[in-house]
Amino acid sequence: FLRNFRDDAILKTKTGSSFMAVFNAWYYSFSPVVAQLIQEHSTLKTAMRIMLYPLIGILRIGAEAFHLVPANMEVAAVVSGVVVSALIGVIYLSTPLTAILAYSSRIRRAANRLQLPVTLAFLGSLASVALTVVLGGLIVLMMFSTSALVLASLTASALIASQLILRLLSRR
């Protein structure tokens, strides 16, 4: 299912194929070594399987989000990418970030100061993606813009979730 979604939907768009080119270059720069290490240690293999289950669910949700925007595949790919990135940020990054922010008030203040820059990075990268789709042919800018959008989505969602969790905990 997920491979078909990637190949038949995401890679058929400029935004999706641009992001996947960057993602694959990053991912395959380290994954063979990690895969070998996991293969050699059964405990690590079990732990990685458990850690990947939420990711599979997140990717399925992203596929559903893609199909909510049937009129334009480029917009659908961006929506799917933002949904997936935001959920990855919430599921995988917000827990350790919450622990770090709860431990250090200095880091918490720094995180609060990041809200505006992260929001601007998200909006700027979204505008850049839209502009490169409209102008076409700017593959390097599209690769940069889609990657920046994913990173901004990850960061924003993790920050927001962590700060919400801390607020809820402080009310107790």
How should these model regions be labeled?
Residues 1-172:
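Long, compositionally biased charged/polar accessory segments in the mid-to-C-terminal portions
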